[in-house]
UniProtKB/Swiss-Prot annotation:
Annotated region (G1), positions in chain: 19-26
Cellular compartments annotated: Cytoplasm
Record-level GO cellular component terms: cytosol
Region called G2, residue ranges: 60-64
GO MF terms, alphabetically ordered: GTP binding; GTPase activity; translation elongation factor activity
Family: Belongs to the TRAFAC class translation factor GTPase superfamily. Classic translation factor GTPase family. EF-Tu/EF-1A subfamily.
Gene3D superfamilies: P-loop containing nucleotide triphosphate hydrolases, Translation factors
Domain tr-type G: from-to ranges: 10-207
Binding-site residues, GTP: 19-26, 81-85, 136-139
Gene: tuf
Protein known as: Elongation factor Tu
EC identifiers of the protein: 3.6.5.3
Known function: GTP hydrolase that promotes the GTP-dependent binding of aminoacyl-tRNA to the A-site of ribosomes during protein biosynthesis.
Length: 397
């Protein structure tokens, strides 16, 4: 196993299978691991192992997710597959498994079905940036024209939800035939190799957190006599260097300052970066000007907002959520990063109420602005207990 260490140099990409029940997502996941295993680029994980994925808790929400990994010549992939439809919805909304791209599996025998649509819509709303199509069960369709029609239908569906349907790679094959083959160079495994090649070329390497604009959610504020005000927190992304200008965003009016010192484990540093727990010394900022719930950010990189649309999953009673539905005008707390902010919910037109265990689109107005961007995750709480999880899908104002 001396090779393992060296391989870690490959860029890491997060991916997952989505699509309608019984269209072959789990079979495809198993087939990919088998082909990769035969090529010496991963370990074969059998269908049953993936299918009985253990339940995990993410923000108090129970999600069953299988994680597998494999490599191509140029990349290391972490791949998620969920046994149930509800698990997918929870996964995508909570961001438990962040996806840089998704493989949508469509059975050629059925064409796009209701969950195919729902998963594509959710992928759009939660910001999954790229989709690759695997047209499965093609061995069961004799008519070439029928395959053409199904492919066209999938492309049109993707276009209707804002994905570039004409440019999306579509790979045809049979996941089951590939899974049954023991020769990675066989015709049965060829579609799997094509699919991985399509992922390699079509899904770009994700930008690393450290390369993004600096942002740190503020957890605590101290004043140090003779030195000024220190804010502490874990750097979410980017790098902060001593002497750089920063903005304090959210809750109050945005203010500017200069970072005059960075401290970590009581040592002075010249910079802090993504993943570091730091204290940042701010010039000319009073202790009372800053509070938990604001963020420290690179100038002009993020703005505060009060009104937004979100995709939300409402916890079921079994998950410790509410026992009763709620209606428009409901006023819970929205927990963003480090703090709770009260907000009022308006449901979409024609939606009467939302039941525990449902997912829905919310229109929210907060009582104070929060540093916000598309894809930002939050929890919905009532008296300190989580009753829902959501993701910002549109900023209104």
């Amino acid at each position: 196993m001396g090779k393992e260490k060296f391989e870690r140099k490959k860029p890491h990409v997060n991916i997952g299978t989505i699509g309608h029940i019984d269209h072959g997502k789990t079979t495809l996941t198993a087939a990919i691991t088998k082909t990769a295993g035969l090529l010496g680029q991963g370990k074969f994980i059998a269908y049953d192992e993936i299918d009985k994925a253990p339940e995990e808790k993410e923000r108090g929400i129970t999600i069953a997710t299988a994680h597998v990994e494999y490599e191509t010549a140029t990349r290391h992939y972490a791949h998620v597959d969920c046994p149930g439809h509800a698990d997918y919805i929870k996964n995508m909304i909570t961001g438990a498994a962040q996806m840089d791209g998704a493989i949508i599996v469509v059975a050629a025998t059925d064409g796009p079905m209701p969950q195919t649509r729902e998963h594509i819509l959710l992928a759009r709303q939660v910001g999954v940036p790229y989709i690759v199509v695997f047209l499965n069960k093609c061995d069961m369709v004799d008519d070439e024209e029928l395959l053409e029609l199904v492919e066209l239908e999938v492309r049109e569906l993707l276009t209707s939800y804002g994905f570039p349907g004409d440019d999306v790679p579509v790979v045809r094959g049979s996941a089951l035939k590939a899974l049954e083959s023991d020769d990675p160079n066989s015709d049965a495994c060829k579609p799997i190799r094509e699919l991985l090649a399509a992922c390699d070329s079509y899904i770009p390497e994700p930008q690393r957190d450290i390369d993004k604009p600096f942002l740190m959610p503020i957890e605590d504020v101290f004043s140090i006599s003779g030195r000024g005000t220190v804010v502490t927190g874990r750097v979410e992304r980017g790098v902060i260097k001593v002497g750089e200008e920063v903005e304090i965003v959210g809750i109050k009016d945005t203010t500017k300052s200069t970072c005059t010192g960075v401290e970590m484990f009581r040592k002075l540093l010249d910079q802090g970066q993504a993943g570091d727990n730091i204290g940042a010394l701010l010039r000319g900022v009073k202790r009372d000007d800053v509070e938990r719930g604001q963020v420290l950010a690179a100038p002009k990189s993020i703005t505060p907002h009060r009104k937004f649309k979100a995709e939300v999953y409402v916890l079921s009673k079994e998950e410790g959520g509410r026992h009763t539905p709620f209606f428009s005008g409901y006023r819970p707390q929205f927990y963003f990063r480090t703090t709770d902010i009260t907000g009022v919910i308006t449901l979409e037109e024609g939606v009467e109420m939302v039941m525990p265990g449902d997912n829905a689109t919310f229109n929210v107005e907060l009582i104070a602005p929060i540093a916000m961007e598309l894809g930002l995750r939050f929890a919905i709480r009532e008296g300190g207990r989580t009753v829902g999880a959501g993701v910002v899908s549109e900023i209104v104002e």
